[in-house]
């Protein structure tokens, strides 16, 4: 090897070595505008792209903790874990899928429920975790939802649920479909007793979740451009063999057609929910009267 080859080789090796020292996860590409973003900046911005304002998927536990007053969160039914009652197997065993999802997310299932305060108002909050098997709804999700709703009823406080789900969990078959009726029944009980329920639909909210609890809020809110519907647009197009309208099943389309009540930016969600909770429970607003956005 000549002296110049040795220098060039050493330079290339040094360059390659320096590249390999960049820790994984430092940069994230926006799924909308494809800009490369600094992950820490994106985290500070609550997973909203600072370039195009695209609302990326948001970790369920982080979402709830950022909503509640610091130090006020108490988890509800944290001990519940899914069971493979049917010994279900598709390409993989269900129990193996559960183990992999639990290892990946650090959560026991696709749903987290908490009690805490929002601007010192006691509330119950819940969120689907899309990273856990697509946020699918099984028996544990249904059970935790019911426990959270019962807590809200017992304390006579608002219940807020963030949806991000592909629908019912196929590996639990009929047990998962039963959760649609189970969650709808407890919400009917809440409505009968005057308990406020606010549903926040995030991207995506589909299948059995959209056909049950997600659309049963006293107020239904969506994040911008969230995909909301029963079947996905590709499935519908293949079935009807027609091109769907522009923006079909997106939050803006649903708002225009009266299926949801409002669209709220993630950065404004906490204050908006606080105003709504105060209004719905006849409590003093946590803000100045002039800042209220709810019309009489």
From Swiss-Prot:
InterPro entries: AcCoA_carboxyl_beta (IPR034733), Acetyl_CoA_COase_Trfase_b_su (IPR000438), ClpP/crotonase-like_dom_sf (IPR029045), COA_CT_N (IPR011762), Znf-ACC (IPR041010)
Record's subcellular location: Cytoplasm
Zinc finger (C4-type) in chain: 30-52
Cofactor(s) required, per the database record: Zn(2+)
One Gene Ontology cellular component: acetate CoA-transferase complex
Protein family per UniProt: Belongs to the AccD/PCCB family.
Name by which UniProt lists this protein: Acetyl-coenzyme A carboxylase carboxyl transferase subunit beta
Native organism: Haemophilus ducreyi (strain 35000HP / ATCC 700724)
Record gene name: accD
